[in-house]
Amino acid sequence: MTVRAVVFDLDGTLVDNMALHSRAFATFMERRGLPPLDAAQRERLDGKRNDDIFPELFGRSLPAAELRVLADEKESLYRALSQGRLSPLRGLDRLLALLEARGIRVAVATSGPAENVRHTLAEAGLAERLSLVVRGDEVPRGKPHPDIFLAAAARMGVPAGDCLAFE
């Protein structure tokens, strides 16, 4: 296999921010009178789109307007908690430089909403280097389906078989 492109997940892969997401979710759940997530629930929901998470948390289908309100509430908590606290994982700068030097294309594939993606990349100082981003709301099916990674490969103009994904 010749690697011509690399696709990275964002949260927990490029930036060590999963504890901040967990704290934001815990605060959200408490405010909404919901029981805390246990480890199995966190693992099952981790990496999924808000549109897939909230119906499961509330145990019912939710109209789009309500989904937006819930997602905005949770994600604004994350952005407030993470302000001034994000940096790339150790070794990422070196890895990106190596990929750039070898002409290997790079993209981000994330379930995060647009405002969080902009915030996280900017706070971590990665926005300039990682400008090709595919979000979960841009593909028919969220993770764990491969749609987001296939879309990233297509946007880079590279066959999926020539891509390496870090999730």
Each PLM stretch: what is its role?
Residues 2-10, 14-93, 98-102, 115:
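N-terminal helical cap/lid subdomain that shapes the substrate entry/recognition surface
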Residues 8, 166-167:
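Active-site flanking residues adjacent to catalytic metal/cofactor-binding acidic residues
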Residues 85-87, 107, 113-166:
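Substrate-recognition "cap/lid" segment bordering the active-site pocket of phosphatases
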